[in-house]
C-alpha cells in the first residue's frame, strides 16, 4: 500500500515538472522527513561496517543491471519489458554522427584498463588526462529518471538501500557520473577487442599508436585523430577505413609481386624455349640441305646406272649378232655330215677322160654303172647335184657346190616334200642314163684315141 502511494506521489511530482536532477530524485526518495520511502523499514542501521555491505563485484553487477549498457551503440538504454527506465532525449547517437562543434562531455577521469578485470575497477577520481580535441559533439541533455519500485523485493531493496547509502559517502559520485562512467566503460571494453591499438601513456590514460602508413593516409584524407582514447564512432570508422585501405594495398602489393615473379618465370621459360626453337630450326635447315644434296647424288647415280645398262645391252646385242653370224658361216663347213657324204662309195663314179680337148664334150660324161636295185633306200639330198658335176670342174667349184648342197640339205630337212621331189628327179635322170642307147663299136679312130690316152 505504501509502495502504491509512493509511486502515485512520484508520478504526480515528476509528470508536471519534466526532467529533474538525479540528486533531487534521491532526495525525493530517501529524505527522512519528506521522502517517499521514509516509512519503509531498511532492516538494519546505516552505520554498519564494510563487512555487512555487499561486495564490490556484486554492487557493480547490480548497478550495471540497472545502469549498464545493454546496447553498445548508446550510453543509456531502457529495459524492453518495463514502462519505466532510464531514457535520454537525444536526437541520435552522438558517436554515430561526425563531430560538428563543441566540446564533448567526458568523465571526471579516464582510467587505465587491464585485461581480465572490469571496465572500471575503482570509482576514485584520478588525474585527468591532458586536454584534447575530440571534435564537435552535440551537447548532452539532462536525463529524467523514473524508478519502478515493484521490481524490487523488500530484502533486495534493503541491501540496495544500504549500498546506495554507503556509496555516496565512499565514492562521492552522482547518478550522472555513474551513467557517464558506464558509457565510458563500454567504450573501453570495445577497445579491448583491439589491444594493438592501445599503448599505456602517462598517468592512467591510453594512447593511440598509429603506423607511418596510417599517418600518411590520414594526412592525405585530411583527418586528424586524437592520440588518446576513447575514440568516437566516426573516428573509429575512419581509422578502420584507413586500415582497410592499408590491408588492401598490402594485398595488392603481394599479388603484384607474385604476378611479377610468375611473369618473370614465364619469360625465362619462353626465352629458353625460343633459343631451343632457333637451334632446332638451324638443325632442320642443315638437314634439308643434306637431303637435297643426297637427292642430287641419287639422281646422278640413277642416270649413270641407266647409261651403263643401255650400253651393256647394246654390247650384248652386238656380241650375240656376231656369234650368230659366225655360227651361220662356220658351222656348215665343219658339219659332221659333210665328210660322211663325201666318203660314201656311191657318191662318185670313176670317169675315163680321153683328152683335155674333149673335156667339155657331152660324150665324155659316162654314167656310173649301177644296178636298178643297188641304190640306197633313201635318196640323198645331194645325189643329183653330185652327179651333175663335171669331171673336169675345179675343186673350188666343188666346195661351193658342197656349201650349196649343205644349204639345200638344211632346207630339205625343213621341207621333206621338196627333198622327195628332188630324189624323184634324180631317179628320173638315172633312168634316162640307163636307157641311153649302147655305143657303137669302137672305130679305129677311137682306138687310136684310146691309145693316145693311154700313153698320156
From Swiss-Prot:
Membrane topology: Single-pass type II membrane protein
Lumenal side, ranges: 339-456
Positions of transmembrane segments: 318-338
Annotated region described as Leucine-zipper, given as residue ranges: 280-301
Glycosylation: residue positions: 408, 415
UniProt key word rRNA-binding: no
Keyword Membrane: yes
Superkingdom of the organism of origin: Eukaryota
Main location: endoplasmic reticulum
Linked residues for Glycyl lysine isopeptide (Lys-Gly) (interchain with G-Cter in ubiquitin): 289
Keywords associated with the record: Activator, DNA-binding, Endoplasmic reticulum, Glycoprotein, Isopeptide bond, Membrane, Nucleus, Signal-anchor, Transcription, Transcription regulation, Transmembrane, Transmembrane helix, Ubl conjugation, Unfolded protein response
CDD domains: bZIP_CREB3
Subcellular location: Endoplasmic reticulum membrane
Biased composition (Polar residues): 71-85
Post-translational modification comment from the UniProt entry: Controlled by regulated intramembrane proteolysis (RIP). Following ER stress a fragment containing the cytoplasmic transcription factor domain is released by proteolysis. The cleavage seems to be performed sequentially by site-1 and site-2 proteases (PS1 and PS2). N-glycosylation is required for optimal proteolytic activation.
Gene Ontology molecular-function annotations: DNA-binding transcription factor activity, RNA polymerase II-specific; RNA polymerase II cis-regulatory region sequence-specific DNA binding
A GO biological process held by the record: response to unfolded protein
Coiled coil stretches, renumbered: none
Cytoplasmic side: 1-317
PANTHER family in UniProt: AGAP001464-PB, CYCLIC AMP-RESPONSIVE ELEMENT-BINDING PROTEIN 3-LIKE PROTEIN 3
Family: Belongs to the bZIP family. ATF subfamily.
Functional summary from the UniProt entry: Transcription factor that may act during endoplasmic reticulum stress by activating unfolded protein response target genes. Activated in response to cAMP stimulation. In vitro, binds the cAMP response element (CRE). Activates transcription through box-B element and CRE. Seems to function synergistically with ATF6. In acute inflammatory response, may activate expression of acute phase response (APR) genes. May be involved in growth suppression. Regulates FGF21 transcription.
Subunit note: Binds DNA as a dimer. May form homodimers. Interacts with ATF6. Interacts with SYNV1/HRD1; this interaction leads to CREB3L3 ubiquitination and proteasomal degradation.
Name of the protein in its database record: Cyclic AMP-responsive element-binding protein 3-like protein 3
Amino acid at each position: 500500500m505504501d509502495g502504491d502511494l509512493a509511486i502515485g506521489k512520484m508520478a504526480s511530482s515528476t509528470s508536471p515538472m519534466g526532467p529533474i536532477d538525479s540528486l533531487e530524485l534521491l532526495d525525493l526518495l530517501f529524505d527522512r522527513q519528506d521522502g517517499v520511502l521514509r516509512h519503509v523499514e531498511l532492516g538494519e542501521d546505516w552505520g554498519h561496517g564494510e563487512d555487512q555491505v555487499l561486495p564490490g563485484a556484486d554492487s557493480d553487477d547490480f548497478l550495471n543491471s540497472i545502469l549498464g549498457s545493454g546496447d553498445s551503440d548508446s550510453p543509456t538504454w531502457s529495459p524492453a519489458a518495463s514502462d519505466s527506465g532510464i531514457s535520454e532525449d537525444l536526437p541520435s547517437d552522438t558517436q554515430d554522427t561526425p563531430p560538428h562543434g563543441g566540446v564533448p562531455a567526458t568523465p571526471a577521469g579516464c582510467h587505465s584498463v587491464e585485461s581480465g578485470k572490469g571496465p572500471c575497477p575503482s570509482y576514485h577520481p584520478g588525474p585527468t588526462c591532458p586536454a584534447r580535441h575530440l571534435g564537435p559533439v552535440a551537447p548532452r541533455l539532462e536525463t529524467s529518471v523514473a524508478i519502478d519500485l515493484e521490481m524490487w523485493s523488500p530484502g533486495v531493496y534493503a541491501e540496495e538501500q544500504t549500498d546506495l547509502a554507503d556509496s555516496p559517502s565512499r565514492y562521492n559520485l552522482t547518478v550522472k557520473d555513474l551513467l557517464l562512467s558506464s558509457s565510458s566503460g563500454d567504450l573501453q571494453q570495445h577497445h579491448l577487442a583491439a589491444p594493438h591499438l592501445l599503448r599505456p601513456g602517462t598517468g592512467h590514460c591510453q594512447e593511440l599508436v598509429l603506423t607511418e602508413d596510417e599517418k600518411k593516409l590520414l594526412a592525405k584524407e585530411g583527418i586528424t585523430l586524437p592520440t588518446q582514447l576513447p575514440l568516437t564512432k566516426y573516428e573509429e570508422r575512419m581509422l578502420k577505413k584507413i586500415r582497410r585501405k592499408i590491408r588492401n594495398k598490402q594485398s595488392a602489393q603481394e599479388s603484384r609481386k607474385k604476378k611479377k615473379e610468375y611473369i618473370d618465370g614465364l619469360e625465362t621459360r619462353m626465352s629458353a624455349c625460343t633459343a631451343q626453337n632457333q637451334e632446332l630450326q638451324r638443325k632442320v635447315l642443315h638437314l634439308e640441305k643434306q637431303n637435297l644434296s643426297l637427292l642430287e647424288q641419287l639422281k646422278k647415280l640413277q642416270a649413270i646406272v641407266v647409261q651403263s645398262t643401255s650400253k651393256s645391252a647394246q654390247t650384248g646385242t652386238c656380241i650375240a649378232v656376231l656369234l650368230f653370224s659366225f655360227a651361220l658361216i662356220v658351222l656348215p663347213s665343219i658339219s659332221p655330215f659333210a665328210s660322211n657324204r663325201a666318203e660314201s662309195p656311191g657318191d662318185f663314179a670313176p670317169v675315163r677322160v680321153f683328152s683335155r680337148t674333149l673335156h667339155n664334150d657331152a660324150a665324155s660324161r659316162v654314167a656310173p654303172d649301177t644296178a636298178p636295185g643297188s641304190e640306197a633306200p633313201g635318196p640323198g639330198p645331194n645325189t643329183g647335184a653330185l652327179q651333175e658335176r663335171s669331171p673336169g670342174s675345179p675343186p673350188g667349184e666343188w666346195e661351193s657346190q658342197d656349201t650349196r648342197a649343205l644349204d639345200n640339205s638344211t632346207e630339205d630337212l625343213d621341207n621333206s616334200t621338196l627333198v622327195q621331189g628332188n630324189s624323184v628327179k634324180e631317179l628320173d635322170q638315172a633312168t634316162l642314163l640307163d636307157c641311153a642307147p649302147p655305143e657303137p663299136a669302137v672305130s679305129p679312130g677311137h682306138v687310136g684315141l684310146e691309145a693316145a690316152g693311154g700313153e698320156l
